[in-house]
């Protein structure tokens, strides 16, 4: 029922733009921070000298004098090479300067002293070593008197102590690294926690906070702005008229309040899948120009108890803030099923969510301006409390489109397609009874794909035919290897369906027969209603459908015998049995009377029966009786019209697919149509030509 239109402009587009800008600023600041960190580290690790204070030193005189100094800022990991330098000792002041230009560079220690009568004393420093046990620096030196005095003069300065300065390698880098290594476990823990927190919130996936541990209790509904209008929807005139009142209320709520009318609380759309229920809800929001919260029934539930009820509250709280607006819950049967029909293990969880939904729709809290719309394929399974007035006031059934609506839907979807002028969309609509709007859209799309595949710019009638077959039975299996005997057997089977359908009293007429394999089927026969699309079926129509379904097996048995029947009739039996069972247990069309033994599907668990064992046997016997009677009828038709059967088979073997015009010609005239005869003559001529070109080997050798 619907045109393929996105129809929703998510308001999260603005949020995504804001998120992009925020992300850009975050990236910018992270780059700045990273640059600062790199600069600090570069400063820390750059090779340079720093100053440390010599806390104390002592020079013991003698020929092998030693200089012991305790220096702050030194660490035991330092090692030094051979040290060369000079030491000057003065009478009153002893100064020590140690220069260091790198970890592995030579170290020079200089001491100076002036002696009154003897001149200067020079000491040559041989080496410098570190005593790792006490952290003191020990300098071993050899001294020589320049004025010829004895080395005992050097002992006169023993015990002299003072302070000095020490130029040493910078140890702050080493200290910073030690501190960082100490903080490393904490940093790793913080980083992992931040990563977990960000991933749990879903920030890495475009900034959306869906399906994460921190938003378990938040609604999964998407807030959007609908652009769909009623003009985008073909058909459904009565349904759209009903929904216009909702549109008017959302546009003019004061008009209803002044009249004292209670505002519509909810609308539930129900019907077969693909009929346009979701599109209608979008159209209401688009016509009213209000926000549209779209959710699914299964989106409320989660593995944790109580999450469903919390998400319902969150959804309605957001809707109240955005009022006037529409809440649309698709497949509401997953959360609104009748209470008491589920097993105890899941009952309490589902009931909590449903109870919260009931309270929000008609409870103590006001929700003026919020209209709830829902869609389901199974209205019969919904809880009665959910369907009562005050919650879902309107129940609108969305049926499969009739022939007029199908034509309109096809026109909507063919607007931007280049269809051949020979294609009549009315004829296509006649050939697609029971198709939903989604299936009709798929027919047009498949036909377009077939044209593109053949590098054509125009869609022809053959593309439409193939597209319909694809939607009904799947793509053709033309590459499947089938023997001539199996091909002939399939032709008899499908011709049997068609022949019985032509001779029974029914509202259906045979439209097409094909023996081209599709999916699991070797072929199929298509029948459509003669006049319109009847929702009501007569008993004669149902019996005719059973007889037609049994026609394939009847033809096999008539031609090949009881021992040569095949498994090709399994789907036919399934169809016939379902029709017969419905006639007996639901429709009151049997000898058991006007009683419904099986309520509407879904109202009771499958293991619960409302009848006795004897009644169950009577039901089975009556179903078997109906099917056997129609099978006998099908066999009688096959035997009485054997010639017509053979003509249908011959036409199928020649053309593989025959349409209604050819089928009706054979049925009325009991002979092949001219088009089929022409194809037969062409095939015979081709076979003769092939035989004449293939000469026996003996003739060639002679």
From Swiss-Prot:
SUPFAM superfamilies: FtsH protease domain-like, P-loop containing nucleoside triphosphate hydrolases
Side of membrane Cytoplasmic, spans: 1-26, 197-702
Keyword annotations from UniProtKB, A to Z: ATP-binding, Cell membrane, Hydrolase, Membrane, Metal-binding, Metalloprotease, Nucleotide-binding, Protease, Transmembrane, Transmembrane helix, Zinc
The keyword DNA repair appears for this protein: no
Enzyme Commission number(s): 3.4.24.-
Intracellular or extracellular location(s): Cell membrane
Entry binding sites for Zn(2+): 493, 497, 572
Chain positions covered by the region annotation Disordered: 682-702
Compositional bias ranges of the Basic and acidic residues kind: 690-702
Main function: Acts as a processive, ATP-dependent zinc metallopeptidase for both cytoplasmic and membrane proteins. Plays a role in the quality control of integral membrane proteins.
GO cellular component, one term: plasma membrane
GO molecular function: ATP binding; ATP hydrolysis activity; ATP-dependent peptidase activity; metalloendopeptidase activity; zinc ion binding
GO biological process, alphabetically ordered: protein catabolic process; proteolysis
Taxonomic source organism: Mycoplasma genitalium (strain ATCC 33530 / DSM 19775 / NCTC 10195 / G37) (Mycoplasmoides genitalium)
Protein name: ATP-dependent zinc metalloprotease FtsH
Similarity annotation: In the central section; belongs to the AAA ATPase family. In the C-terminal section; belongs to the peptidase M41 family.
Primary localisation category: membrane
Cofactor note: Binds 1 zinc ion per subunit.
Transmembrane segments: 27-47, 176-196
Binding-site residues, ATP: 271-278
Oligomer status and interactors: Homohexamer.
HAMAP family cross-referenced by the UniProt entry: FtsH
InterPro entries recorded: AAA+_ATPase, AAA_lid_3, ATPase_AAA_core, ATPase_AAA_CS, FtsH, P-loop_NTPase, Peptidase_M41, Peptidase_M41-like
Lineage, top ranks: Bacteria, Bacillati, Mycoplasmatota, Mycoplasmoidales, Mycoplasmoidaceae
UniProt membrane topology term: Multi-pass membrane protein
Cofactor: Zn(2+)
